[in-house]
Design a protein with these regions (language model features):
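N-terminal low-complexity, intrinsically disordered segments
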Residues: 1-90, 239, 266-275
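Aromatic/basic-lined ligand-recognition segments
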Residues: 6-9, 74-80, 129-219
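Short, solvent-exposed segments of well-ordered alpha helices
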Residues: 8, 99-103, 231, 235
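Glycine-rich, often proline-containing surface loops adjacent to acidic residues and nearby aromatics
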Residues: 15-22, 86-102, 128-137, 211-227
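Short glycine-rich, low-complexity/disordered patches
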Residues: 51-63, 121-139, 167-172, 247-275
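Hydrophobic alpha-helical segments and helix pairs
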Residues: 83-125
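Long, compositionally biased interface segments
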Residues: 210-275
Length: 275
Protein backbone atom coordinates (compact mmCIF):
# COMPACT_ATOMS: atom_id res chain seq x y z
CA UNK A 1 0.00 0.00 0.00
CA UNK A 2 2.73 2.46 0.95
CA UNK A 3 4.38 2.00 -2.45
CA UNK A 4 1.29 3.45 -4.17
CA UNK A 5 1.33 6.61 -2.10
CA UNK A 6 2.86 9.60 -3.83
CA UNK A 7 2.83 13.33 -4.35
CA UNK A 8 1.09 14.85 -7.36
CA UNK A 9 1.60 18.38 -8.72
CA UNK A 10 -1.40 20.63 -8.26
CA UNK A 11 -1.88 20.72 -12.05
CA UNK A 12 -1.30 17.99 -14.60
CA UNK A 13 1.65 19.70 -16.32
CA UNK A 14 3.11 21.83 -13.55
CA UNK A 15 2.89 22.60 -9.83
CA UNK A 16 2.76 26.40 -9.98
CA UNK A 17 0.03 27.96 -7.84
CA UNK A 18 1.21 31.52 -8.34
CA UNK A 19 3.99 33.54 -9.94
CA UNK A 20 4.83 37.18 -9.23
CA UNK A 21 7.17 39.80 -10.69
CA UNK A 22 8.05 43.06 -8.91
CA UNK A 23 10.36 45.98 -9.64
CA UNK A 24 11.26 48.44 -6.88
CA UNK A 25 12.63 51.98 -7.14
CA UNK A 26 15.09 53.98 -5.07
CA UNK A 27 12.54 56.65 -4.14
CA UNK A 28 8.83 57.34 -4.61
CA UNK A 29 7.53 59.21 -7.63
CA UNK A 30 6.43 62.81 -6.99
CA UNK A 31 2.73 62.81 -6.12
CA UNK A 32 1.49 64.61 -9.24
CA UNK A 33 3.48 62.41 -11.59
CA UNK A 34 2.40 59.31 -9.68
CA UNK A 35 -1.21 60.34 -10.19
CA UNK A 36 -0.64 60.70 -13.93
CA UNK A 37 1.11 57.33 -14.10
CA UNK A 38 -1.62 55.47 -12.20
CA UNK A 39 -4.35 57.14 -14.26
CA UNK A 40 -2.73 55.98 -17.50
CA UNK A 41 -2.09 52.53 -16.02
CA UNK A 42 -5.72 52.29 -14.94
CA UNK A 43 -6.93 53.13 -18.43
CA UNK A 44 -4.63 50.48 -19.90
CA UNK A 45 -5.61 47.90 -17.30
CA UNK A 46 -9.33 48.37 -17.84
CA UNK A 47 -8.86 48.11 -21.61
CA UNK A 48 -7.37 44.67 -20.89
CA UNK A 49 -10.31 43.59 -18.74
CA UNK A 50 -8.90 44.44 -15.30
CA UNK A 51 -11.05 46.11 -12.67
CA UNK A 52 -9.88 48.65 -10.08
CA UNK A 53 -9.79 47.60 -6.43
CA UNK A 54 -11.13 50.22 -4.04
CA UNK A 55 -8.94 50.91 -1.00
CA UNK A 56 -10.99 52.44 1.79
CA UNK A 57 -9.32 54.46 4.49
CA UNK A 58 -9.85 57.38 6.85
CA UNK A 59 -8.73 60.94 6.18
CA UNK A 60 -8.56 63.68 8.81
CA UNK A 61 -9.14 67.33 7.93
CA UNK A 62 -6.80 69.29 10.21
CA UNK A 63 -8.76 72.52 9.70
CA UNK A 64 -12.33 71.34 10.27
CA UNK A 65 -11.54 68.29 12.39
CA UNK A 66 -13.81 66.24 10.16
CA UNK A 67 -13.03 62.57 9.63
CA UNK A 68 -14.13 61.13 6.29
CA UNK A 69 -13.67 57.81 4.55
CA UNK A 70 -11.91 57.58 1.23
CA UNK A 71 -8.64 56.85 -0.49
CA UNK A 72 -5.78 59.24 0.14
CA UNK A 73 -3.96 60.53 -2.93
CA UNK A 74 -0.60 58.92 -3.57
CA UNK A 75 -1.61 55.58 -2.09
CA UNK A 76 -1.38 52.09 -3.61
CA UNK A 77 -3.42 51.30 -6.72
CA UNK A 78 -4.52 47.80 -7.66
CA UNK A 79 -6.30 46.20 -10.61
CA UNK A 80 -7.52 42.59 -10.87
CA UNK A 81 -9.19 40.44 -13.48
CA UNK A 82 -12.85 39.55 -12.77
CA UNK A 83 -11.85 36.04 -11.63
CA UNK A 84 -9.11 37.44 -9.37
CA UNK A 85 -6.46 35.34 -11.11
CA UNK A 86 -4.27 38.24 -12.24
CA UNK A 87 -3.28 41.32 -10.29
CA UNK A 88 -1.47 44.55 -11.14
CA UNK A 89 -0.30 46.54 -8.11
CA UNK A 90 1.32 49.97 -8.19
CA UNK A 91 2.72 52.01 -5.30
CA UNK A 92 4.76 55.21 -5.45
CA UNK A 93 7.89 53.04 -5.24
CA UNK A 94 7.06 49.72 -6.95
CA UNK A 95 5.22 47.94 -9.76
CA UNK A 96 4.09 44.32 -9.36
CA UNK A 97 2.23 41.74 -11.45
CA UNK A 98 1.02 38.35 -10.20
CA UNK A 99 -0.91 35.48 -11.74
CA UNK A 100 -2.49 32.24 -10.54
CA UNK A 101 -3.21 31.37 -14.18
CA UNK A 102 0.42 30.62 -15.00
CA UNK A 103 0.96 28.55 -18.15
CA UNK A 104 4.61 29.10 -19.03
CA UNK A 105 7.23 31.81 -18.61
CA UNK A 106 7.04 33.30 -22.12
CA UNK A 107 3.33 34.25 -22.01
CA UNK A 108 3.60 35.27 -18.35
CA UNK A 109 6.43 37.66 -19.09
CA UNK A 110 4.59 38.72 -22.23
CA UNK A 111 1.82 39.95 -19.93
CA UNK A 112 4.42 41.69 -17.77
CA UNK A 113 5.82 43.41 -20.86
CA UNK A 114 2.35 44.33 -22.13
CA UNK A 115 1.52 46.71 -19.28
CA UNK A 116 3.43 46.42 -15.96
CA UNK A 117 6.80 46.95 -17.65
CA UNK A 118 5.40 49.95 -19.52
CA UNK A 119 4.30 51.40 -16.19
CA UNK A 120 7.77 50.74 -14.78
CA UNK A 121 9.26 52.58 -17.75
CA UNK A 122 7.45 55.74 -16.64
CA UNK A 123 9.16 55.38 -13.25
CA UNK A 124 12.59 54.79 -14.79
CA UNK A 125 12.34 58.12 -16.60
CA UNK A 126 12.45 59.83 -13.19
CA UNK A 127 13.84 57.46 -10.52
CA UNK A 128 16.34 54.60 -10.50
CA UNK A 129 15.61 50.89 -10.15
CA UNK A 130 16.58 49.57 -6.71
CA UNK A 131 15.63 45.89 -7.01
CA UNK A 132 13.94 43.22 -9.12
CA UNK A 133 12.14 40.20 -7.66
CA UNK A 134 10.56 37.05 -9.12
CA UNK A 135 8.56 34.63 -6.93
CA UNK A 136 7.12 31.14 -7.42
CA UNK A 137 4.66 29.18 -5.28
CA UNK A 138 4.63 25.44 -6.14
CA UNK A 139 2.24 22.93 -4.57
CA UNK A 140 2.38 19.11 -4.38
CA UNK A 141 -0.54 17.06 -3.00
CA UNK A 142 -0.03 13.85 -0.98
CA UNK A 143 -2.28 10.96 -2.01
CA UNK A 144 -2.56 9.56 1.51
CA UNK A 145 -3.23 10.97 4.97
CA UNK A 146 -1.11 12.58 7.67
CA UNK A 147 -0.67 9.19 9.30
CA UNK A 148 1.37 7.97 6.30
CA UNK A 149 2.71 11.32 5.13
CA UNK A 150 6.23 10.92 3.72
CA UNK A 151 8.02 14.12 2.56
CA UNK A 152 10.95 11.99 1.40
CA UNK A 153 8.82 10.96 -1.58
CA UNK A 154 9.09 14.53 -2.86
CA UNK A 155 12.10 16.22 -1.29
CA UNK A 156 15.66 15.29 -2.15
CA UNK A 157 17.54 13.67 0.70
CA UNK A 158 20.57 15.81 -0.07
CA UNK A 159 18.71 19.11 -0.34
CA UNK A 160 20.06 21.82 1.97
CA UNK A 161 16.89 23.88 2.15
CA UNK A 162 14.52 21.92 4.42
CA UNK A 163 15.32 21.89 8.13
CA UNK A 164 15.89 18.21 9.13
CA UNK A 165 14.01 18.64 12.40
CA UNK A 166 10.96 19.96 10.58
CA UNK A 167 10.92 17.18 7.99
CA UNK A 168 11.10 14.52 10.72
CA UNK A 169 8.12 16.06 12.50
CA UNK A 170 5.52 13.98 10.66
CA UNK A 171 2.77 16.59 10.96
CA UNK A 172 2.33 20.06 9.52
CA UNK A 173 5.62 21.97 9.59
CA UNK A 174 7.41 24.98 8.16
CA UNK A 175 11.02 25.45 7.09
CA UNK A 176 12.56 28.75 6.04
CA UNK A 177 16.03 29.56 4.75
CA UNK A 178 17.50 32.63 3.09
CA UNK A 179 20.85 34.13 2.29
CA UNK A 180 22.63 36.91 0.43
CA UNK A 181 25.06 36.16 -2.35
CA UNK A 182 27.07 38.03 -4.93
CA UNK A 183 25.85 38.06 -8.51
CA UNK A 184 27.18 39.76 -11.60
CA UNK A 185 25.41 42.97 -12.58
CA UNK A 186 23.87 43.69 -9.17
CA UNK A 187 24.98 44.91 -5.76
CA UNK A 188 23.78 41.69 -4.13
CA UNK A 189 21.21 38.91 -4.45
CA UNK A 190 18.73 37.68 -1.82
CA UNK A 191 17.49 34.10 -2.08
CA UNK A 192 14.57 32.85 0.04
CA UNK A 193 13.06 29.37 0.23
CA UNK A 194 10.02 28.42 2.32
CA UNK A 195 8.87 24.80 2.47
CA UNK A 196 5.56 24.08 4.21
CA UNK A 197 3.70 20.87 4.96
CA UNK A 198 0.06 21.88 5.41
CA UNK A 199 -3.52 20.82 4.71
CA UNK A 200 -4.73 21.84 1.26
CA UNK A 201 -8.31 21.75 -0.01
CA UNK A 202 -8.67 21.27 -3.74
CA UNK A 203 -11.75 22.70 -5.47
CA UNK A 204 -14.68 20.29 -5.78
CA UNK A 205 -13.23 17.84 -3.26
CA UNK A 206 -14.34 16.75 0.19
CA UNK A 207 -11.87 17.44 2.95
CA UNK A 208 -8.29 18.72 2.79
CA UNK A 209 -5.26 16.62 1.89
CA UNK A 210 -1.70 16.86 3.20
CA UNK A 211 0.50 18.84 0.85
CA UNK A 212 3.92 20.41 0.51
CA UNK A 213 4.24 23.96 -0.75
CA UNK A 214 7.57 25.27 -1.99
CA UNK A 215 8.01 29.04 -2.18
CA UNK A 216 11.13 30.27 -3.95
CA UNK A 217 12.16 33.84 -4.64
CA UNK A 218 15.20 35.71 -5.86
CA UNK A 219 15.57 39.45 -5.44
CA UNK A 220 18.47 41.26 -7.07
CA UNK A 221 19.34 44.61 -5.50
CA UNK A 222 20.89 47.31 -7.68
CA UNK A 223 21.10 49.96 -4.97
CA UNK A 224 21.78 49.83 -1.25
CA UNK A 225 22.34 52.86 0.99
CA UNK A 226 26.04 53.41 1.47
CA UNK A 227 27.02 51.13 -1.41
CA UNK A 228 27.60 51.47 -5.12
CA UNK A 229 24.61 51.72 -7.42
CA UNK A 230 24.18 49.71 -10.63
CA UNK A 231 22.21 51.59 -13.27
CA UNK A 232 19.46 49.40 -14.74
CA UNK A 233 17.21 50.25 -17.68
CA UNK A 234 14.11 48.57 -19.08
CA UNK A 235 16.01 46.26 -21.43
CA UNK A 236 18.23 45.13 -18.57
CA UNK A 237 15.12 44.43 -16.47
CA UNK A 238 13.76 42.20 -19.25
CA UNK A 239 16.98 40.22 -19.51
CA UNK A 240 17.44 40.00 -15.76
CA UNK A 241 13.87 38.77 -15.22
CA UNK A 242 14.43 35.74 -17.42
CA UNK A 243 17.81 35.06 -15.80
CA UNK A 244 16.18 35.04 -12.36
CA UNK A 245 13.41 32.76 -13.65
CA UNK A 246 15.99 30.27 -14.91
CA UNK A 247 17.89 30.41 -11.62
CA UNK A 248 14.65 29.66 -9.76
CA UNK A 249 14.08 26.61 -11.97
CA UNK A 250 17.54 25.39 -11.01
CA UNK A 251 16.79 26.04 -7.35
CA UNK A 252 13.60 23.96 -7.44
CA UNK A 253 15.60 21.17 -9.07
CA UNK A 254 17.85 21.12 -6.01
CA UNK A 255 14.80 20.65 -3.76
CA UNK A 256 12.56 18.04 -5.41
CA UNK A 257 13.37 14.50 -6.56
CA UNK A 258 14.33 13.68 -10.15
CA UNK A 259 11.10 11.72 -10.62
CA UNK A 260 8.97 14.79 -9.87
CA UNK A 261 11.23 16.96 -12.02
CA UNK A 262 10.48 14.59 -14.90
CA UNK A 263 6.75 14.57 -14.20
CA UNK A 264 6.58 18.36 -14.42
CA UNK A 265 9.26 18.48 -17.17
CA UNK A 266 11.20 21.01 -15.13
CA UNK A 267 14.18 21.27 -17.44
CA UNK A 268 13.11 19.54 -20.64
CA UNK A 269 10.14 18.77 -22.82
CA UNK A 270 6.86 20.40 -21.95
CA UNK A 271 8.15 21.91 -18.73
CA UNK A 272 10.78 23.88 -20.61
CA UNK A 273 7.89 25.64 -22.34
CA UNK A 274 5.71 25.63 -19.24
CA UNK A 275 8.13 26.96 -16.67
Amino acid sequence: MSETLRFDPIYSEHAIERCAWTVFFTQPLPEKLYGNVTQAAGDGAQERGFQPVAFRGIQFNAITGQVVSGQASGGPVEFVTPDGAQQLSITPQSVSFASTRYVRWTPFFGQVSDLPLKVAERFVDVVSVSALKVEYWDRFIWSGEWSDFDPNKLLRGDNQYAAPGAVRGGNAWHSHVGWFERTEGAVRRLVNINIDAVDFLRPNTIGPKPSIGVYTTIQDAFFLPGSLQVDVGIEAIKTRSTEIHNDLKSLLGQIILDDMQSRISLNSGARADVR
